Regions:
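Recognition helices and adjacent regulatory flanks at domain boundaries
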Residues: 68, 94-98, 125
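Short loop segments at secondary-structure junctions
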Residues: 25, 54-57, 65, 128-133, ...
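Local beta-strand/beta-hairpin segments that build beta-sheet-rich folds
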Residues: 29, 110-112
């Protein structure tokens, strides 16, 4: 089944992304702002962090372009602002498609949690999908490289400050551990039934 967005994300020519303003509980206030402009007290922007994991329990990461204002050249997960009129699920699907050319279906998406980070309401998702790196189409102003890494590799990269330290990282690790336990349990049940 194909998932389509009924409207194009709102962008004005010559300006940044137009985003909804939220309250601390994640409710839209009915107001918008141009990304990069300051927010008043009690105003927040919704962002998504998308953790793509494959069947080998590896995580797909991307190296931020050297043109980026924030954290240029740093390895990170796939993330971005939820645009005005867009849901966080739509942003979760849109951001990786724009940045690296991966097509994600809603059935592959698991909402992990929401965390408050300053003025950011960060909705965190895990996407279960295998992806051939040779199929990547990089958005040059955003991404300079992509690669699959193990959790162990990622921990080492974070300790060397090569990978951005996300507050939800250990929630993603827990998700992978629980997924591995479910796989092992199914495998054991299959062997017992033979």
């Amino acid at each position: 089944m194909e998932h389509t967005v009924s409207h194009a994300p709102k962008r004005e020519k010559g300006t940044g992304e137009i985003c909804d303003i939220y309250d601390v509980y994640g409710n839209r206030t009915g107001k918008t702002f141009v990304r990069g402009e300051p927010l008043s007290d009690g105003q927040y922007v919704m962002v998504v962090d998308v953790w793509i994991v494959n069947s080998n329990d590896e995580i797909l990461i991307q190296k931020r372009s050297l043109q980026k204002k924030d954290l240029p050249g740093t390895w990170a997960t796939h993330s971005g602002c939820v645009l005005a009129g867009e849901t966080s699920l739509q942003a979760c699907i849109r951001e990786p498609r724009e940045e690296i050319g991966i097509q994600i279906l809603p059935s592959q998406v698991h909402k992990l949690n929401r965390k408050l980070r300053g003025k950011l309401l960060s909705e965190n998702f895990v996407v279960e999908q295998d992806f051939d790196l040779s199929d990547a189409v990089l958005q040059e102003e955003e991404v300079s490289a992509v690669r699959w890494v193990t959790v162990s590799d990622l921990k080492q990269m974070a300790s060397r400050r090569e990978f951005y330290r996300y507050p939800e990282f250990f929630d993603v690790v827990r998700f992978l551990e629980e997924r591995r336990k479910r796989k092992d349990c199914r495998k054991q049940n299959t062997q017992n039934n033979q």
